């Protein structure tokens, strides 16, 4: 096992793209990655979406990453949708509704 976590993620994305998908479902694609590898993965997903027209549904817990890379955010708390809209409309109240915590208590 000589591949890093980021390399494994890129291989996984490449394997999925070979199938010519209309959509990629990415569950925590940057979990356990260093910041540089996380940026590379998110840049790849954004490029795949914008260049190839493939919808990428990405499950993230990093609010800052979601705000930077998303065109649309769906926030869920206790299995219920509490937000569905563009990142630019996310407010501190919405973050509190999603995470049940004040924004100042979160790493953003």
Ranges and model annotations:
Residues 60-61:
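H-loop/switch region of ABC-family ATPase nucleotide-binding domains
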